[in-house]
Amino acid sequence: MNTNESEHVSTSPEDTQENGGNASSSGSLQQISTLREQDRWLPINNVARLMKNTLPPSAKVSKDAKECMQECVSELISFVTSEASDRCAADKRKTINGEDILISLHALGFENYAEVLKIYLAKYRQQQALKNQLMYEQDDEEVP
């Protein structure tokens, strides 16, 4: 899926009816388009928090910088996810997994990120297995 597909706003009668008839005016079309684009982005507060945690405590971040970063990281996520989705479709699968993301990062030229995420994914899976094991052991102890 490319970015134009996700931003497309149809003005067909069916879509106009689905949107409560509001899509007929150009102002409403603009609002619907903006909402759809906004829905694709990460919440600005989350982006701002990540930026703040990365920068020195005395650093200030402008609203424009936050909005720019919000759009950039959201586009990157969409780009990688789209590549992973295409891979899943080619394999006739419906669920994107961590390996799909890693392969997509490599395919898109983000090898450095893929290597770091591969390590993170292995550690995450290891912790999840340990957590599941502990929960299983607790369940065994509670059974009389």
From Swiss-Prot:
Give residue spans, biased composition: Polar residues: 9-31
Q: What domain of life?
A: Eukaryota
- A single Gene Ontology CC term: CCAAT-binding factor complex
| Region called Subunit association domain (SAD), residue ranges | 69-80
Quote the DNA-binding region ranges, renumbered to this chain: 42-48
Q: What does this protein do?
A: Acts a component of the CCAT-binding factor, which is a transcriptional activator and binds to the upstream activation site (UAS2) of the CYC1 gene and other genes involved in mitochondrial electron transport and activates their expression. Recognizes the sequence 5'-CCAAT-3'.
Q: Output this protein's name.
A: Transcriptional activator HAP3
> Assembly and partners?
Component of the CCAT-binding factor (CBF or HAP complex II), which consists of one copy each of HAP2, HAP3, HAP4 and HAP5. The assembly of the HAP2-HAP3-HAP5 heteromer (HAP complex I) occurs in a one-step pathway and its binding to DNA is a prerequisite for the association of HAP4.
Say yes or no: keyword DNA-binding present: yes
Q: GO MF annotations for this entry?
A: DNA-binding transcription activator activity, RNA polymerase II-specific; DNA-binding transcription factor activity, RNA polymerase II-specific; protein heterodimerization activity; sequence-specific DNA binding
Question: Cross-referenced SUPFAM superfamilies, in alphabetical order?
Answer: Histone-fold (SSF47113)
